Regions:
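Short amphipathic alpha-helix with an adjacent loop that forms part of the alpha/beta core around
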Residues: 184-195
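Mid-domain Rossmann-like dinucleotide-binding core that forms the NAD(H)/NADP(H) cofactor-binding site
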Residues: 105-183
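C-terminal hydrophobic helical "lid"/dimerization subdomain
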Residues: 259-314
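A generic alpha-to-beta junction signature in SAM-dependent methyltransferases
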Residues: 125, 193, 216-217
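Glycine-rich phosphate-binding loop and adjacent beta-alpha segment
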Residues: 169, 207-281
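NAD(P)H dinucleotide-binding glycine-rich loop of Rossmann-like/cofactor-binding domains
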Residues: 52-59, 67-135, 280
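N-terminal Rossmann-like NAD(P) cofactor-binding module of classical short-chain dehydrogenase/reductase
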Residues: 75, 132, 178, 200-201
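Glycine-rich beta-strand-centered segment in the early N-terminal region that forms part
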Residues: 10-28, 36-80
């Protein structure tokens, strides 16, 4: 917490093509942790002593844009602040009659698109696949499990960190759910997937990836979306120790970042949005309140404090 501070600043006047947005909901996401390391990556690190950024939904209070009027609700990438000056090209209209604001930051937004891309483009899910997803009670993981069912999976297995989350996964339609905090992850997964795994959607890395490799069937596919178990590690990871199995099993392990697949958004909305709107795909939101809660909400992502999408209501 000592690495964050809250500041009040004077905002400049709007330039042509800009809007002033009062944020109502801000998101925090695990990928932000990677932007706190000064290393070369797919996205530049955050600048020291400058505002954090992230997804947000808010109401236009002033406008010098022909695209947006005062009172419009928009989503944009300048969260972590209560008021933002946004270029019109960064904003997208949001219809709160279709879904609440948090949904546009989660299941209907980049979170849902991440799950869909990982399954369809990276893991190339097929009819009858057995799918395992780690971090399954999180925003992406819970979407993966439900999308997989509608994309033809014959069995869906998830891992989570409490009995409450395990119960929730079963309510969401997972065939089996593992509480990894009970230990013997490999043994639990062996019991949950007696016929092996065809697709592993990895949000965790480490021992989860090791356990999944051990249960993967020949020609299995791993979509490597995140490695939350390692983001705060100061020592080299101890797992996976069985990567050589990928050779004999002819496995495909493929990492991805969403920015390379934004052109899939239209297909995602066409196929998945009706399922979300009808309630066939459900989603959870964990809410904290006030701009002061942003750092704490972010840190909770790494200790299991969220079920589904973590947002901060202004």
């Amino acid at each position: 917490m000592e690495n964050f501070r809250l500041e009040q600043v004077e905002l400049p006047d709007l330039a042509e093509g800009q809007i002033l947005v009062e944020n109502t909901v801000n998101t925090v996401d695990p990928y932000m942790r990677g932007r706190m390391n000064d290393v070369k990556s797919y996205i530049p690190p955050f600048d020291l002593n400058k505002p954090m950024t992230g997804g947000a939904v808010g109401v236009v209070r002033e406008s010098r844009s022909e695209k947006f009027q005062v009172g419009d609700t928009v989503s944009h990438p300048l969260g972590w602040q209560d008021i933002a000056i946004v270029d019109e090209g960064q904003a997208k209209p949001v219809d709160l009659n279709v879904a609440p604001a948090a949904a546009y930051l989660g299941i209907l937004g980049l979170t849902g698109l991440t799950a869909y891309v990982g399954l369809t483009r990276i893991a190339e899910i097929k009819e009858g696949d057995v799918v395992f997803v780690s971090g399954a009670a999180g925003a992406v993981g819970s979407a993966v499990g439900q999308f997989a069912r509608h994309l033809g999976a014959s069995r869906v297995i998830g891992s989570a960190g409490s009995e409450e989350k395990v119960a929730r996964l079963k309510e969401l339609g997972f065939d089996a759910a593992i509480n990894y905090r009970e230990g013997d992850l490999a043994g639990q997964l062996r019991q949950a997937a007696p016929e092996g795994i065809d697709v592993y959607f990895d949000n965790v890395g480490g021992d989860h990836l090791e356990a999944a490799i051990a249960r993967m069937n020949t020609f299995g596919r791993v979509a490597m979306c995140g490695a939350i178990a390692q983001y705060n590690d100061t020592q080299p990871p101890t797992a996976p120790r069985n990567l050589a199995l990928a050779i004999g099993k002819c496995l495909t392990l493929r990492g991805f970042v969403l920015g390379q697949y934004l052109d899939v958004a239209g297909e995602f909305r066409e196929r998945m949005a009706p399922l979300i709107a009808s309630g066939q795909v459900r989603y959870d939101v964990t809410t904290r309140h006030g701009i002061e809660a942003m750092p704490g909400a972010f840190l909770e992502l790494f200790t299991g404090g969220n079920t589904g999408k973590m947002v901060v209501q202004m």
